[in-house]
Amino acid sequence: MEKTLSIIKPDAVKKGVIGKILDRFESNGLRIAAMKKVQLSKEQAENFYAVHKERPFFKDLVEFMISGPVVVSVLEGEGAVLKNRDLMGATNPKEAKAGTIRADFAESIDANAVHGSDSLENAKIEIDFFFKPNEIC
């Protein structure tokens, strides 16, 4: 069964919509195989988003991701990566389709409520970043 990583970002955690977002996953056939609430350190955020290190938004992204706790989940299901990305909606909530997580809960392209793996290969890397094998069941 396919797995993907989801992060409910600090803006959505602060708004108290964790349960509503998790319900979207479960009611659309994605099973929560692992989950934890964490406060990322600056080093963790920099390492997780290292692929964006040379991009102009990197510093702001890191600062945002350490601004409050996040909820990190492993989602499992048929076509989990693509299904999660469809549920999240476009990166910019103004462009996200109505009924998607970002259209309903995100404030801006920066505070956009959720992160999801963009490929199976990256899902494995991202899952391994946050979870030990025995934490996923």
Curated annotation (Swiss-Prot):
GO MF terms held by the record: ATP binding; metal ion binding; nucleoside diphosphate kinase activity
Q: Name one Pfam family in it.
A: NDK
Catalytic activity line of the entry: a 2'-deoxyribonucleoside 5'-diphosphate + ATP = a 2'-deoxyribonucleoside 5'-triphosphate + ADP; a ribonucleoside 5'-diphosphate + ATP = a ribonucleoside 5'-triphosphate + ADP
Q: Is Nucleotide-binding included in the keywords of this UniProt record? A: yes
| Residues annotated to bind ATP | 9, 57, 85, 91, 102, 112
Q: Which family does it belong to?
A: Belongs to the NDK family.
Q: What is this protein called?
A: Nucleoside diphosphate kinase
Q: Which organism is it from?
A: Campylobacter jejuni subsp. jejuni serotype O:6 (strain 81116 / NCTC 11828)
